[in-house]
UniProtKB/Swiss-Prot annotation:
Antimicrobial peptide. This is Xenoposin precursor fragment R2. It comes from the Eukaryota. It is found in: Secreted. The keyword Ribosomal protein does not apply. Expressed by the skin glands. The keyword tRNA processing does not apply. It comes from Xenopus ruwenzoriensis (Uganda clawed frog).
């Protein structure tokens, strides 16, 4: 459903954001 889709999107964004914080380019 739409809820799980939003959850996956937020999870991806959080993951990418965390990687950027750990290893800034």
């Amino acid at each position: 459903g739409w809820a799980s889709k939003i959850g996956q999107t937020l999870g991806k964004m959080a993951k990418v954001g965390l990687q950027e914080l750990i290893q800034p380019k």
